[in-house]
C-alpha cells in the first residue's frame, strides 16, 4: 500500500530534524522525532507523581575513522612474536659463557694444586670474584635499566662482560706459561699462581655477570608469550654449552698430533673456548634489535585527543504538565559522572577505523587499544572534558550557565599531557570555559593507578530543574552512542602513561642510597625467592667447583701433589678427565630437561618442579659418597642437570609473573616502582653469595674430613633444606588486586 503524499515516512518520523546545536535548547513541545513511553507505577518505586514521558531517540550512524599520524604512534610496549631462530640466537651467549665456565670449573683447581697452592687456600680462589659480583651486580643491573646508548640498554653490557671473560680466560689457561716467561722456576710458580688467580677472578665475575643482561635483554624484546620460551631456550643453550665444554676438556689432547702441535692440553682448550665465546657473543648481539632508552630529560612525542565533537545528548525528561518552555533566568547545573559498563571487547564498542595505512601518514590504532592499558585513557578523558572547543560540553548562550564542578581521581605523580594537558598541582585546577569556571578537583583514592575509563560504567546524569529554587533530582539515563564514540576516540589515541613515559621522566638519577633503599624495601615474594635461590646455588656450587677433585681423589684414589711420574699423580689426572665426562653428562641432562620443562609446566605446578629438582639433587650427591663404582657415580650426574636447569629457569619465570601484578611493580608516584634489571640482579646475587660461603666453608671442611667427601655431604644437606623452603615459603602466585573497589569508584563525581 502506497502512503499518501502528505504523510511522513516512518523512517523520517523516527529521526529528529533538529540541528545538533538545538539539542541543549530549552525543550519545547515540538520534538517531533521522539517516541513517547509511559513509566509504570512499579518502575517508579510506587511513588505518586504526574505521569512522565520518556523520549527515545535512535542512535546515529557509526562514526568515521579516527585517524592519527603513524609516526606518533608509540609501539614500544608492543612486541611481535619472536621466531625460534631469533630466540635461539638470542641465547647463544649462554652457550659461550657456559662453555668457558666448564673449562674454568674443570681445570682451575687441578692447575692451582699442581702449581703448589696449599689445600687450605685453594678454595679461597673462588672468594674474590663472588664478593665483587655481590657488590657490583645490583649496580650493573640498575645501570643497564637506565643506559641510554644507541645500541640499547643491555647489549653494551653483554659486549663488555664477554670481553672481560675472554681476557680472564686468557690469563687462566696461560698463566703458568706467562709466569715461566717472567720469573718463575720449576719449583716456584708465584707469578703463575698470581696471574691464574687474577684470571679466575675476572673470568668468573664476567661470566656470571653476563647472565643478567642477557636475561633482561630477552625479556625486554619479547612479549609475555615468548618470555617462557626464551628462558627455556636460554637454559637449553647453557646446558649444551657446558656439555660441549666438558667434552672438549675430557679429551686427552696431549696424546693427539693436533694437541702436540698447538702446545698441549691447556693451549687447545684455550683456542676452542676463545673462538666459541667470540662467535656466540656476536650471534647474540645481532639477534634481535633493541630499542634505545630515551634520555632522562627527553619527552616522547605524545598525541592530542582528536577534536571530533561527540553527538549531543537527547533532551531532558520533563514531568507531564510542566510548562512547555523554561524561563531564561532559570539556573542550569550540569552534573557528570560515569557508571555504565564499557570494555574494549564489548559488543557496544565496534572497531570503527581499524585500518592501518602505510601509504599515507594516517592510521587508526584501535586494534592496539587493548594493549595500551587503561591508565593511558584517563589523561585523554580529562583532556576531552576540559578542552574549550569541545562542542558536546557547550551550552547555548540563551541559557545562563553556572560553575561546573567536576572531581577527578587524583592523577599519579609525574602525570602530564603535553602542550595542553594537565599539570601537577597541589590544589584543584580551575579552567575557563567561555567565561565560566570549570573546577577540576582531586579525589583521594586508594588505587590511583586503577582509574581507567574502560573499567568503569558510564552514565550521564542530567537533573531536571522545575524552577530556580526547586528540588533537583538525579535521575540517570544511558547514553549508548556517546559511550561508544568516547570509547573509540579514547582508545584510538595513546597518551603518556604511568607505566611508560611519565614514570620514566619522573625517576630520580641513580644513586647508591636509592639502590640500597630498593634492596632494603625488597618485597616479601622476592626476598623468599632469593633465599630459595641462594640455597639452590649453595648446594650446586659446592658440588660443581670440586667435582673433578672429588673424582680424582675419592673415586680414583689419586694425589694431585704426588710427583708427576708417580702412579698416584696419573690416577688423579685420569679422575679429573673422567670428572669432565661426568660434568658432560650433567650438562646434557640439563639441556634435555630444559627442552621438556615447558611441557612439564603444563602438567605439574612450579612448586612440584622445584621440590623434585632439590630432592633429586640431594639424593644424587648423597649416594655419590656411598658408592665407589664409576658407573653409578656417573649416572647420578643426570640429577645435577635437573637442578641446574631449574635454577636457570623457574626463578626468573616467577619474577616475570610477579611483574604482571600492578601492586608488585609499584609506581613512581609513591616511589615504590621497581626495575626488572635490579630484581634480576638481586636474584643473581644469590649465586655470588653462595659462592662466597662455599669458598669460606668447604676448604676447612675438606681438611677436617680428610677428603672431598665433605663437599658432597654439604651439598646434599643444603639441597634437602631447599626442598623444605621451596615447599613452605616461596610465593608462587600473587593475588590480583581487588577489583570491587575499582568498580565502585566512579570516574567523575558530583561536587
From Swiss-Prot:
Q: Which UniProt keywords apply?
A: Membrane, Phosphoprotein, Sugar transport, Symport, Transmembrane, Transmembrane helix, Transport
How is expression of this protein distributed across tissues? Predominantly expressed in brain.
**Which taxonomic lineage does the organism of this UniProt entry have?**
Eukaryota, Metazoa, Chordata, Craniata, Vertebrata
Organism for this UniProt entry? Rattus norvegicus
Q: What GO molecular function annotations does the UniProt record carry, in alphabetical order?
A: D-glucose:proton symporter activity; galactose:proton symporter activity; sucrose:proton symporter activity
Membrane-spanning ranges: 93-113, 123-143, 155-175, 191-211, 233-253, 268-288, 536-556, 576-596, 606-626, 630-650, 688-708, 710-730
What's the protein called, per UniProt?
A: Proton-associated sugar transporter A
User: Residues where Phosphothreonine occurs?
Assistant: 500
UniProt-listed Pfam families: MFS_1 (PF07690)
Family listed: Belongs to the glycoside-pentoside-hexuronide (GPH) cation symporter transporter (TC 2.A.2) family.
| Tagged with keyword Phosphoprotein | yes
Q: Which GO terms describe its biological process?
A: D-glucose transmembrane transport; galactose transmembrane transport
Gene behind this protein = Slc45a1
CDD domains tied to this protein: MFS_SLC45_SUC (cd17313)
Membrane topology label: Multi-pass membrane protein
Q: Characterize the pH dependence.
A: Optimum pH is 6.5.
Q: Which reaction does it catalyse?
A: D-galactose(in) + H(+)(in) = D-galactose(out) + H(+)(out); D-glucose(out) + H(+)(out) = D-glucose(in) + H(+)(in)
Any idea what job this protein has? Proton-associated glucose transporter in the brain.
Keyword Plastid recorded: no
Where does the UniProt annotation locate this protein?
Membrane
Q: Which GO terms describe its cellular component?
A: membrane
* Highest taxon, organism lineage: Eukaryota
Amino acid at each position: 500500500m502506497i502512503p499518501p503524499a502528505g504523510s511522513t515516512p516512518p523512517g523520517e518520523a523516527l529521526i529528529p530534524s533538529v540541528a545538533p546545536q538545538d539539542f541543549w535548547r530549552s525543550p519545547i513541545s515540538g520534538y517531533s522525532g521522539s517516541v513517547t513511553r509511559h513509566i509504570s507505577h512499579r518502575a517508579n518505586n510506587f511513588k505518586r507523581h504526574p505521569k512522565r514521558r520518556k523520549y527515545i531517540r535512535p542512535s546515529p550512524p557509526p562514526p568515521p575513522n579516527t585517524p592519527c599520524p603513524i609516526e606518533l604512534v608509540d609501539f614500544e610496549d608492543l612486541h611481535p612474536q619472536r621466531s625460534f631462530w631469533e630466540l635461539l640466537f638470542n641465547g647463544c651467549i649462554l652457550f659461550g659463557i657456559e662453555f668457558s665456565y666448564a673449562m674454568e670449573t674443570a681445570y682451575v683447581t687441578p692447575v692451582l694444586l699442581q702449581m703448589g697452592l696449599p689445600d687450605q687456600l685453594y678454595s679461597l680462589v673462588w672468594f674474590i670474584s663472588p664478593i665483587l659480583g655481590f657488590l657490583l651486580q645490583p649496580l650493573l643491573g640498575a645501570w643497564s635499566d637506565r643506559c641510554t646508548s644507541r645500541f640499547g640498554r643491555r647489549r653494551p653490557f653483554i659486549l663488555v662482560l664477554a670481553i672481560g671473560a675472554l681476557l680472564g680466560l686468557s690469563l687462566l689457561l696461560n698463566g703458568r706459561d706467562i709466569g715461566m716467561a717472567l720469573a718463575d722456576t720449576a719449583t716456584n710458580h708465584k707469578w703463575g699462581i698470581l696471574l691464574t688467580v687474577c684470571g679466575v677472578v675476572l673470568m668468573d665475575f664476567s661470566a656470571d655477570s653476563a647472565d643478567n643482561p642477557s636475561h633482561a635483554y630477552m625479556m625486554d624484546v619479547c612479549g609475555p608469550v615468548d618470555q617462557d620460551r626464551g628462558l627455556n631456550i636460554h637454559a637449553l643453550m647453557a646446558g649444551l654449552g657446558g656439555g660441549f665444554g666438558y667434552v672438549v676438556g675430557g679429551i686427552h689432547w696431549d696424546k693427539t698430533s693436533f694437541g702436540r702441535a698447538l702446545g698441549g692440553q691447556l693451549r687447545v682448550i684455550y683456542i676452542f673456548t676463545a673462538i666459541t665465546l667470540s662467535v656466540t657473543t656476536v650471534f647474540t648481539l645481532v639477534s634481535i634489535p633493541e630499542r634505545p632508552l630515551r634520555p632522562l630529560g627527553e619527552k616522547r612525542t605524545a598525541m592530542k585527543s582528536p577534536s571530533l565533537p561527540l553527538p549531543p545528548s537527547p533532551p531532558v525528561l520533563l514531568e507531564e504538565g510542566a510548562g512547555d518552555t523554561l524561563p531564561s533566568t532559570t539556573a542550569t547545573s550540569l552534573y557528570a559522572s560515569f557508571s555504565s559498563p564499557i570494555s574494549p571487547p564489548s559488543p557496544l564498542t565496534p572497531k570503527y577505523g581499524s585500518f592501518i595505512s602505510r601509504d599515507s601518514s594516517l592510521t587508526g590504532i584501535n586494534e592496539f587499544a587493548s594493549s595500551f592499558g587503561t591508565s593511558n585513557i584517563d589523561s585523554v578523558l580529562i583532556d576531552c572534558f576540559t578542552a574549550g572547543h569541545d562542542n558536546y560540553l557547550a551550552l547555548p548562550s540563551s541559557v545562563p550557565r553556572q560553575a561546573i564542578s567536576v572531581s577527578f581521581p587524583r592523577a599519579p605523580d609525574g602525570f602530564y599531557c603535553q602542550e595542553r594537558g594537565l599539570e601537577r598541582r597541589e590544589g584543584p585546577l580551575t579552567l575557563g570555559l567561555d567565561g565560566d569556571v570549570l573546577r577540576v578537583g582531586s579525589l583521594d583514592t586508594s588505587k590511583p593507578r586503577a582509574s581507567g575509563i574502560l573499567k568503569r560504567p558510564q552514565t550521564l546524569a542530567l537533573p531536571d530543574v522545575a524552577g530556580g529554587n526547586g528540588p533537583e533530582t538525579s535521575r540517570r539515563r544511558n547514553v549508548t552512542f556517546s559511550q561508544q564514540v568516547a570509547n573509540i576516540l579514547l582508545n584510538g589515541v595513546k597518551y603518556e602513561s604511568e607505566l611508560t613515559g611519565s614514570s620514566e621522566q619522573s625517576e630520580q638519577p641513580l644513586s647508591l642510597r636509592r639502590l640500597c633503599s630498593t634492596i632494603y624495601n625488597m618485597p616479601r615474594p622476592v626476598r623468599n625467592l632469593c633465599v630459595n635461590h641462594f640455597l639452590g646455588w649453595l648446594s650446586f656450587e659446592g658440588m660443581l667447583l670440586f667435582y673433578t677433585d672429588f673424582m680424582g681423589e675419592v673415586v680414583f684414589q689419586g694425589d694431585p701433589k704426588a710427583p708427576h711420574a708417580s702412579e698416584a699423580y696419573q690416577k688423579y689426572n685420569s679422575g679429573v678427565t673422567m670428572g669432565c665426562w661426568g660434568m658432560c653428562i650433567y650438562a646434557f641432562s640439563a639441556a634435555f630437561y630444559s627442552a621438556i620443562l615447558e611441557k612439564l609446566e603444563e602438567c605439574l605446578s612450579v612448586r612440584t618442579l622445584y621440590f623434585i629438582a632439590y630432592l633429586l639433587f640431594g639424593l644424587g650427591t648423597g649416594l655419590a659418597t656411598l658408592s665407589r663404582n664409576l658407573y653409578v657415580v656417573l649416572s647420578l650426574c643426570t640429577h645435577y642437570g635437573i637442578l641446574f636447569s631449574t635454577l636457570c629457569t623457574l626463578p626468573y619465570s616467577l619474577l616475570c609473573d610477579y611483574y604482571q601484578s600492578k601492586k608488585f611493580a609499584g609506581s613512581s608516584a609513591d616511589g615504590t616502582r621497581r626495575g626488572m634489571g635490579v630484581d634480576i640482579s638481586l636474584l643473581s646475587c644469590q649465586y655470588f653469595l653462595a659462592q662466597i660461603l662455599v669458598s669460606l666453608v668447604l676448604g676447612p671442611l675438606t681438611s677436617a674430613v680428610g677428603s672431598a667427601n665433605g663437599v658432597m655431604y654439604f651439598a646434599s644437606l643444603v639441597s634437602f633444606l631447599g626442598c623444605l623452603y621451596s615447599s613452605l615459603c616461596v610465593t608462587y602466585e600473587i593475588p590480583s588486586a581487588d577489583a570491587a573497589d575499582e568498580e565502585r569508584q566512579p570516574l567523575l563525581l558530583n561536587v
